[in-house]
Structures are given as C-alpha cells and as structure tokens.
Amino acid sequence: GGRYLTKEIHPFSFEEYLEYRHVHLTKFWELSPIKNDVLRLFSDYFYYGGLSEVFNMQDKKSWLQSLYQKILYSDIVIRKGVRNERSLRLLIRKLADSVMQPTAIKRLQNILQGDGTKIARETIASYLDYLHESFLTFSISCFTDSITERETIKKHYFYDNGILNLFLFQPETKLLENIVAIQLYKKYGEDLYYYNKNMEVDFCVPKDGLLVQVSYRMTEDATRNREISALQKVGKFLNAKKCMIITYDQEETILSAELGMDIEVVPVYKFLLDEEKY
C-alpha cells in the first residue's frame, strides 16, 4: 500500500491515451476519419481522466471512487495522522466545488465552520499541503505584487479529471478549466498564474506573455465579448505576445486591432495534442 498517487497520478496525456487506444495521429489527422476516433475518445478522457488502470474498467466511476478512498485514507489520514477526517473530506468537496474560483483560506475556514466544524486556518493550510504532496490537487497563485494575496488566495485544481468528476454535478465547465490547468501546470509549473485585477483572466504566464481564457461555448454574444474584452485589457497591460480562448469544440481566429494580433479560439482536444504550437 501507500503512495498510490506517486505511482498512479501521473496520468496519461491525451496523446498517450490515443496511442494506448491505437489511434496514431498523422500530419493531417483532422481531415481524415481519425478525427471521429479522436473526438469519441476525448469524451472518455475528459470525464474519466488519464489514469491507465481506469481505461479498461467497466465501472470507471466506482474504480476511481475506491482509488480516491485509498489515497485519502492511506496516503493522508494514516500517513499524516489526520485527526479530523470529516473536515478533510469536506475540504476536498469544497475545493472541487470552487475549481474555477480564487479561494482564500479564510473563506474555506468559514465554509467548514458553517458546517459545524471548528478548524484553524493553519490546519487547513496543512491539509492543502497534504493534498498537494499526495498528488490529488495543485494550486496556482494570483499574479500580483501583494505577497499576502499570492500566498492566501489561490485557485485549486485536481491532478486528474476522473477524480474531480467524482464530486461534480453538471461538471462540464469545471472539467474543461481543470484539464486546461493540468496541461498548463505540467508545462509551466510555478510560472503559471491567474489574473484578477479589475478583469479576470483564467491563466497567465507573464514571463512568456501568454494569456489563456477558458470558455465551454462562445455562442452567446455576452460570453464572447466578456472573454475578448478581458484578454484585450489585460493583454495590453501585461504586454501579451499570445492570447488564446480554449473551448470544448469551437475554433476560429479573432482579429484584435486593439492588441495588434489574433486571438486564437482553440478546441480543447487540439490544445492538448499540440504542445509545441500552444
């Protein structure tokens, strides 16, 4: 037993998953029948994650549920001597609920206390460390000069969509932002931030001038204008070199005169498959 996740939560990338399923991408795969296979397999990968053991399970959800219980119990509760298991479980649920929102430790404390649990902020900070160490969750900081804000108000994500999906009802928008976070965090680590000063941008890598918004669908004008406007304002302020909007399946190029460059709207499966381009 022990250390399930150090072995198991280095999930397959989407490309590795396709290889595992014997789908080999050719140069022009999007124009070939392979595209249908890619889309079908992406749906599985999106909802159930990239842990190889889950791929051939009939009942994927219950396998993921039992893996989660094992990690929680063996890797965290027993290993770390957690006395308040109920609070830890509740904290994980709340992190899943708030995947897209910057969340302060103080707010987590209020939520847990509202549920009748007395818990110190230091304890919550320790629990968050345990979740990171056991590869259940990771977090990104706000891009700001305020050290306090950087340290205390973070966005929390799960290392695997399949495990996150155990906690969600109508999961699509959260799973989409989470899968983008996994990919960007793998690539940029501590250089990945979110931006939240007057305007919100889901992800930014200031040293590379990269800004990324995540929007499940861009069919409504209000959504579309909000995403573009945030990229334009923050892009000018941060001197962005590349701006992207990741969607579930929409693709287009938006010319931004204000930024003097294109904003690329990219379907998530393409974003995951072309690391060099994106």
Where are these regions (language model features)?
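Conserved RecA-like P-loop NTPase ATPase core
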Residues: 17, 46-49, 131, 160, ...
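Mobile, glycine- and charge-enriched loop segments
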Residues: 205-224, 269-277
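Domain-level recognition of nuclease-like catalytic cores that cleave nucleotide substrates
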Residues: 250-278
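Catalytic cores of nucleic-acid endonucleases
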Residues: 218-260
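Interdomain motor-coupling "hinge/lid" segment immediately C-terminal to the ATP-binding subdomain
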Residues: 1-102
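Conserved beta-strand scaffold positions in the cores of enzyme catalytic domains, especially
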Residues: 4-8, 243-245, 265
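Accessory nucleic acid-recognition modules appended to NTPase machines
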Residues: 55-211, 216
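Conserved nucleotide-binding/hydrolysis micro-motifs of P-loop NTPases
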Residues: 11-16, 163, 250-251
